[in-house]
Amino acid sequence: EQNAAIVEVNAGPSLIFHLKPASGKAQPVGQEIANHLFPPGADFRIPVIGICGEKGKTPVAEMIAHFLRLTNVYVGLSCSKGLFFGNRAIANTNTSTWESARRTLLNRAVEVAVIENNHLSMLIEGLAYDRCQVGVVLNVDPKSNFPQYAIYDEDQVFSIVRTQIDVVLPTGVGVLNADDPMVVQMAELCDGEVIFFSENPNSEVIKTHLQNDGRAVLVGKQQITLKSGKLE
């Protein structure tokens, strides 16, 4: 439209001539470059899936990572069995820690991060991410306290575990165990959608959730059923 042509591509241009010209008005070229690379309002987060619970969280993290790999995305997995980038094992020690989770998030090749969080690490270091797309809470043992850190009762334990649901994005999902009363209480803390799962086909929590047009997963002996409202 302007009959212009590209005469040079400079990998390291000097912006000083535009910001402080010898004559004329300064131009905000730095801001324009940043806006071009990172448009205002755009979402640059990769999907993060956080899993916590007193037991069962490692196989759940591994299963989620496996299914994601089947979709041909590069998965970063940080769990108690090790640190994995794609199909490669980087470490074979317990990496369900803040440091390992952060390492996963800093890997530029990772397209989806699956992070297992143990309760002690959550207490001492917190979560390695500020928000996540999916937060999974499997179970809570109210007797699993940490007296060395002045955590004595179930309310304090609840406050630790709830952080996994506190950080779920409004566009995300909190996946909660309908068979654990303490976990059920976390539903109201989730900014996003809540999906309950249960092994009890007669679960009152599931029934109420479905009546409110929610989604739920029922785990049977030979099948897994996803229900949405009154649909199955």
For each feature predicted by the language model, list its residue ranges.
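Walker A (P-loop) phosphate-binding motif
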Residues: 40-86
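Flexible active-site lid/hinge loop adjacent to a nucleotide/diphosphate
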Residues: 89-210, 230-232
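Short, well-ordered alpha-helices that flank and scaffold nucleotide-derived cofactor binding pockets
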Residues: 35, 66-70, 106, 188
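Conserved beta-strand scaffold positions in the cores of enzyme catalytic domains, especially
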Residues: 48, 75-77, 135, 194-196, ...
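ATP-dependent carboxylate activation and anion-phosphoryl transfer catalytic cores
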Residues: 1-52
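General structural feature for long, well-ordered alpha-helical segments within catalytic domains
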Residues: 25, 29, 33, 47, ...
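A short, flexible beta-alpha/helix-coil linker loop
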Residues: 12-16, 82-85, 141-145
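Short polybasic amphipathic segments
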Residues: 81-89, 215-230
